[in-house]
């Protein structure tokens, strides 16, 4: 079933390359292969086909030439050989199917424990891959009624091998993920299945989770708004479903917490294996936007409204220049003068009265941040629209004052400015996984980027059925008016035929413009965009988008992850009927922003006609819901009411109608709402399936779903995602792109619109008529390729810069986790190391191994040493002067007989309880002293003297600290918590400041390119210098804080950390 083994020709004249006769976790083509070697390896195949071509040329030449060319390309494609190799896995899985089918449910469940025992005995996952896949296939068939096709087995193998599986829309990627997720979860180290939003994560956890739970694995779900305890439990499960942003923020939050009980991930190894759904969206589209956690900064919010008024005074091109491609503005001399005059300041860049940043942000808000395109205003707040998905991200804010500038432009309350306290890019986040895989319908065009950035190949998995979608030629218009009018006509034409239509737009503004246009012509339709009144019903709209006469206008969100099934999705439609009948009796809440009053809304479309038995069951379920609602005073929230319906629908999947009816009869006096809803759902579902099957056949006869793209995107891949909505699983369908030369993309990337207008004028005098053909398509393709290269350059630069920061971040986060989760003694060891390191810096910074101590800065050395100790050394070192220390060093240098075991220097005080302190210190400092002891001071006659001095002062400081801690009377647990708190707080404080400095540096180094210096190399050098300085400052503040804490009066002890 579902086999595509006919793709493997029986007439192959050349065996598979040796490197492809067995699979491994990393494929050989991830390494650089010279073009010469590659073409030599495939030359025999080409020869073979040339021979075959000579045999068939005498037949119908015209009919065979295209197919022959395609066959040659198949056999010379590396992808062909890889897929061919995976058919060995398919054969193994298929051969095991009869044996697995014969197992009882209990025997099938017991396979999980058996696999884990075999792993413990030394077998590898590869040894049991085929059998595990066969077990999952059978479990899916028994639990959710779905059997993996052969091509889906290939997809599972690709995922397990740590590659990206490109599978076209409707090929069942969600089901494919169960294979690799189950196999890798057997190790007990945790598997993350990552989706692009909460809805898909919840859907997959509930739907595919049934397969895993049936086999005895635990399944977790991470959702926005969950508490730390819930997150911790769900991350501890064998398989965890989450979305990419929640995963990233949980990682960052775990590295900000000061309480080990608040850690939610599986530390010390939170990452094992991830399957990323829509991997191109996560790693490429979202790759330009790093994840940021911000804290409030002390900024003057009153400046933003003033700057917004100044921006309104300034005129584009006269007072400032705009670079659309770079999203940057530059003030002219005239603009600077006018701004300074309006603000009554002599210099916009005055450090004591800085206005430049506020004015530049106000101009950016004016030119680049458009309402209903980049953001919407709701409840007095400016909410970001993700331009790639079309969804509102209400928890996200633009950084560096841009969001405040937008709020000022809109006259909204200005929220507190922010500074970054933690950040990471998605590229760096997913590189933390030892094994990473992904799946999507559109990755092949970005294969080079995946290979270069992640060393992950893209494998194109064959479709189960041939693709018969028709992609109509692109139509180009000189004006936007002409484009929208032709879109309207095409929608009207398709509506007249009864074909469903999906229109893709790039913004809320465009979707609502087209909606108004269709309303004027009386064409009923649904709108799906970021506005909450539409977004809340995204899945419902997409479920009906394949029905006869359905017209759906959508932004880029386009319901990714939800298939558009011709004739409608019977399960979604049946659920909608149940909810319409039940919810109003259980809750008094209604959907905010009700859209059903619009007479042109297609919410109901043509209502599914349910049979008499279904109507009776619906009436009974409604009656019970009415009774339950009355007894509860309709106090349930809509969310709780929907969860009751969801639980009931899940029950319908595990019980047959007879069992449900018996349950209702047994509990009739208790008004068993759940069984009644489940029974009604099964009956309604049967009616919906019959209706959708009939309507789907009718839609197929008419030509299937028609997709209209109203603008080219900045990547061919995103255009292909929209095209992929039509023609799923061998269905008929068609697509058409209509573009205007006034579209923003042409302005942003400096397309030669004058050339295009001249070309159009040669063909027609009507500027509202379209042109199409190879000439214009080639130009548009070149434009998209340039855009792809540009954004690839941005992502590449972001990754390269973040790789520098990632080294530093890993050091800080590893240290943090060691302090947070390590033994109590590790905190003391770090305190001792920091004390010795700070003393080393003081001594080395004020001495010279080539000069006599009388030429050292002994007064400064002594002052700095006393300053770090608070009041701890006031009594013992009160009589020590520069002369005393000089005399001690001279005596020591002349005597040369004192050893460090004496733990003292002439004329200087002996450490209290010295031997006890040093014994404890030596165990912790051994590695530190081995590494840096004799390499800090350089060469010279007085090198040994410097080493003795810094070791003595370090010993003295540590011994004094241990003495005062012991005399405090506090127990060890309290002392270690104080140490941990000081260590974490100082580290966080300086890491936060370091991130601010590094962000400033990343902007500043670009200017150095004008001096022919490499910005990345400059960033590495200065960033390293900043990091070393940060670590030094962290150590010093830690030592100062901990010593000041213990040396201050007990009634006023505080952590002196700003």
From Swiss-Prot:
<dbReference type="GO" id="GO:0017038">
    <property type="term" value="P:protein import"/>
</dbReference>
<dbReference type="InterPro" id="IPR036266">
    <property type="entry name" value="SecA_Wing/Scaffold_sf"/>
</dbReference>
<keyword id="KW-0811">Translocation</keyword>
<keyword id="KW-0813">Transport</keyword>
<dbReference type="GO" id="GO:0016464">
    <property type="term" value="F:chloroplast protein-transporting ATPase activity"/>
</dbReference>
<dbReference type="InterPro" id="IPR011116">
    <property type="entry name" value="SecA_Wing/Scaffold"/>
</dbReference>
<dbReference type="InterPro" id="IPR014001">
    <property type="entry name" value="Helicase_ATP-bd"/>
</dbReference>
<dbReference type="GO" id="GO:0031969">
    <property type="term" value="C:chloroplast membrane"/>
</dbReference>
<dbReference type="InterPro" id="IPR027417">
    <property type="entry name" value="P-loop_NTPase"/>
</dbReference>
<keyword id="KW-0653">Protein transport</keyword>
<dbReference type="GO" id="GO:0005524">
    <property type="term" value="F:ATP binding"/>
</dbReference>
<dbReference type="Pfam" id="PF07517">
    <property type="entry name" value="SecA_DEAD"/>
</dbReference>
<keyword id="KW-0150">Chloroplast</keyword>
<feature type="binding site">
    <location>
        <begin position="167"/>
        <end position="174"/>
    </location>
    <ligand>
        <name>ATP</name>
    </ligand>
</feature>
<dbReference type="InterPro" id="IPR014018">
    <property type="entry name" value="SecA_motor_DEAD"/>
</dbReference>
<keyword id="KW-0809">Transit peptide</keyword>
<comment type="function">
    <text>Involved in protein export. Probably interacts with other proteins to allow the postimport or conservative sorting pathway for inner membrane proteins in plastids. May have a central role in coupling the hydrolysis of ATP to the transfer of proteins across the membrane.</text>
</comment>
<dbReference type="GO" id="GO:0006886">
    <property type="term" value="P:intracellular protein transport"/>
</dbReference>
<dbReference type="InterPro" id="IPR011115">
    <property type="entry name" value="SecA_DEAD"/>
</dbReference>
<keyword id="KW-0472">Membrane</keyword>
<keyword id="KW-0547">Nucleotide-binding</keyword>
<dbReference type="Pfam" id="PF21090">
    <property type="entry name" value="P-loop_SecA"/>
</dbReference>
<dbReference type="InterPro" id="IPR000185">
    <property type="entry name" value="SecA"/>
</dbReference>
<dbReference type="GO" id="GO:0006605">
    <property type="term" value="P:protein targeting"/>
</dbReference>
<dbReference type="InterPro" id="IPR036670">
    <property type="entry name" value="SecA_X-link_sf"/>
</dbReference>
<dbReference type="InterPro" id="IPR044722">
    <property type="entry name" value="SecA_SF2_C"/>
</dbReference>
<dbReference type="Pfam" id="PF07516">
    <property type="entry name" value="SecA_SW"/>
</dbReference>
<keyword id="KW-1278">Translocase</keyword>
<comment type="subunit">
    <text>Part of a second Sec protein translocation apparatus. Interacts probably with SCY2.</text>
</comment>
<keyword id="KW-0067">ATP-binding</keyword>
<dbReference type="Pfam" id="PF01043">
    <property type="entry name" value="SecA_PP_bind"/>
</dbReference>
<keyword id="KW-0934">Plastid</keyword>
<comment type="similarity">
    <text>Belongs to the SecA family.</text>
</comment>
<protein>
    <recommendedName>
        <fullName>Protein translocase subunit SECA2, chloroplastic</fullName>
        <ecNumber>7.4.2.4</ecNumber>
    </recommendedName>
</protein>
<dbReference type="InterPro" id="IPR011130">
    <property type="entry name" value="SecA_preprotein_X-link_dom"/>
</dbReference>
<dbReference type="InterPro" id="IPR020937">
    <property type="entry name" value="SecA_CS"/>
</dbReference>
<feature type="transit peptide" description="Chloroplast">
    <location>
        <begin position="1"/>
        <end position="58"/>
    </location>
</feature>
């Amino acid at each position: 079933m579902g086999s595509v083994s006919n793709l493997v020709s029986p007439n192959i004249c050349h065996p598979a390359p040796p490197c492809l006769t067995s699979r491994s976790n990393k494929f050989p083509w991830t390494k650089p292969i010279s073009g010469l070697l590659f073409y030599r390896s495939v030359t025999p195949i080409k020869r073979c086909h040339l021979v075959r071509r000579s045999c068939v040329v005498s037949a119908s030449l015209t009919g065979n030439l295209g197919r022959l060319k395609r066959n040659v390309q198949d056999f010379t494609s590396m992808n062909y050989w890889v897929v061919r190799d995976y058919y060995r896995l398919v054969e193994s899985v298929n051969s095991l199917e009869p044996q697995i089918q014969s197992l009882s449910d209990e025997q099938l469940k017991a396979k999980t424990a058996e696999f884990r025992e075999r792993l413990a005995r030394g077998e590898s996952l590869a040894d049991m891959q085929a059998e595990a896949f066969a077990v999952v296939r059978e479990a899916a068939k028994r639990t959710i009624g779905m059997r993996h096709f052969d091509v889906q087995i290939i997809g599972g193998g690709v995922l397990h091998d740590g590659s990206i599986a490109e599978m076209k829309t409707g090929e069942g990627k969600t089901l494919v993920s169960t294979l690799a997720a189950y196999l890798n979860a057997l190790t007990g180290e945790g598997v993350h299945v990552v989706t692009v939003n909460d809805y898909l994560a919840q859907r997959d956890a509930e739907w595919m989770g049934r397969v895993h739970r049936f086999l005895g694995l635990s399944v977790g779900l991470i959702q926005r708004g969950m508490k730390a305890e819930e997150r911790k439990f769900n991350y501890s499960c064998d398989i965890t479903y989450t979305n990419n942003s929640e995963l990233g923020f949980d990682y960052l939050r775990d590295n900000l917490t000061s309480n080990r009980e608040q850690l939610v991930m599986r530390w010390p190894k939170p990452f094992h294996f991830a399957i990323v759904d829509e991997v191109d969206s996560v790693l490429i589209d979202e790759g330009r936007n790093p994840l940021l956690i911000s804290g409030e900064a002390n900024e003057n919010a009153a400046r933003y409204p003033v700057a917004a008024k100044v921006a309104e005074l300034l005129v584009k091109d006269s007072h400032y220049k705009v670079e659309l491609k770079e999203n940057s503005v530059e003030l002219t001399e005239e603009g600077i003068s006018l701004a300074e005059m309006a603000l009554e300041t002599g210099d916009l860049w005055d450090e004591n009265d800085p206005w430049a940043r506020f004015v530049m942000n106000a101009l950016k808000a004016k030119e680049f941040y458009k309402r209903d395109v980049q953001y919407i205003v709701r409840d007095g707040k400016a909410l970001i629209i993700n331009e790639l998905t079309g969804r509102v991200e209400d928890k996200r804010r633009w950084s560096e004052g841009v969001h405040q500038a937008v709020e000022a432009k809109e006259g909204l309350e200005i929220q507190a400015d922010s500074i970054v306290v933690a950040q990471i890019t998605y590229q760096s986040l997913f590189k933390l996984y030892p094994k990473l895989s992904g799946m999507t319908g559109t990755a092949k065009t970005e294969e080079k980027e995946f290979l270069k950035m992640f060393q992950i190949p893209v494998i194109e998995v064959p479709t189960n059925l041939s693709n018969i979608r028709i992609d109509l030629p692109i139509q180009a218009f000189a004006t936007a008016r002409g484009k929208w009018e032709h879109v309207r006509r095409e929608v009207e034409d398709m509506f007249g035929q009864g074909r469903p239509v999906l229109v893709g737009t790039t913004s809320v503004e465009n979707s609502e413009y087209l909606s108004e246009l269709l309303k004027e012509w009386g064409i009923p339709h649904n709108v799906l965009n970021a506005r909450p009144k539409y977004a809340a019903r995204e899945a419902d709209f997409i479920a009906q988008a394949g029905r006869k006469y359905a017209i759906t206008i959508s932004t880029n969100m386009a319901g990714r992850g939800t298939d558009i099934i011709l004739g409608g999705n019977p399960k979604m439609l049946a659920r909608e009927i149940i909810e319409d009948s039940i919810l109003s009796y259980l809750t008094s809440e209604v959907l905010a922003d009700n859209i059903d009053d619009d007479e042109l809304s297609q919410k109901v479309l043509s209502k599914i006609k349910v049979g008499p038995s279904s109507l009776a069951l619906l009436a009974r379920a409604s009656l019970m819901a009415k009774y339950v609602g009355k007894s509860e005073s309709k106090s349930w929230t809509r969310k709780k009411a929907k969860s009751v319906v969801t639980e009931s629908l899940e029950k319908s999947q595990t019980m047959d109608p007879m069992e449900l009816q018996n349950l209702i009869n047994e509990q009739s006096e208790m008004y068993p709402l759940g069984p009644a809803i489940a029974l009604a759902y099964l009956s309604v579902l049967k009616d919906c399936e019959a209706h959708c099957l009939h309507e789907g056949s009718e839609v197929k006869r008419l030509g299937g779903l028609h997709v209209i793209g109203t603008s080219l995107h900045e990547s061919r891949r995103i255009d292909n995602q929209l095209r992929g909505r039509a023609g799923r699983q061998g269905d008929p369908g068609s697509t058409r792109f209509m573009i205007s030369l006034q579209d923003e993309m042409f302005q942003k990337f400096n397309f030669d619109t004058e050339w295009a207008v001249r070309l159009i004028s040669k063909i027609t005098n009507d500027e509202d008529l379209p042109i199409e053909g190879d000439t214009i398509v080639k130009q548009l393709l070149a434009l998209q390729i340039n855009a792809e290269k540009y954004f690839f350059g941005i992502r590449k630069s972001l990754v390269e810069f973040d790789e520098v920061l990632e080294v530093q971040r890993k050091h800080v986060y590893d240290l943090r986790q060691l302090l947070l989760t390590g033994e109590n003694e590790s905190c003391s060891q770090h305190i001792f190391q920091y004390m010795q390191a700070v003393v080393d810096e003081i001594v080395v910074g004020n001495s010279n191994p080539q000069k006599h101590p009388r030429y050292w800065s002994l007064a400064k050395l002594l002052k700095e040493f006393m300053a770090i100790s608070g009041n701890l050394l006031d009594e013992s070192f009160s009589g020590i002067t520069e002369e005393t220390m000089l005399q001690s060093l001279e005596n020591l240098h002349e005597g040369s007989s004192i050893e460090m075991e004496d733990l003292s220097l002439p004329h200087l005080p002996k450490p209290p309880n010295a031997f006890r302190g040093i014994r404890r210190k030596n165990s912790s400092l051994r590695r530190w002293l081995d590494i840096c002891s004799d390499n800090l001071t350089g060469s010279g006659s007085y090198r040994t003297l410097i080493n003795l001095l810094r070791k003595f002062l370090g010993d003295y400081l540590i011994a004094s600290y241990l003495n005062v801690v012991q005399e405090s009377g506090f127990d060890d647990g309290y002392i270690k918590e104080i140490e941990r708190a000081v260590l974490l707080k100082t580290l966080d404080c300086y890491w936060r400041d370091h991130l601010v400095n590094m962000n400033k540096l990343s902007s500043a180094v670009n200017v150095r390119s004008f001096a022919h210096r490499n910005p990345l190399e400059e960033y590495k050098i200065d960033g390293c210098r900043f990091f070393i300085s940060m670590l030094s400052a962290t150590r010093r503040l830690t030592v100062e804080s901990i010593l000041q804490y213990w040396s201050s009066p007990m009634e006023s002890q505080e952590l002196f950390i700003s």
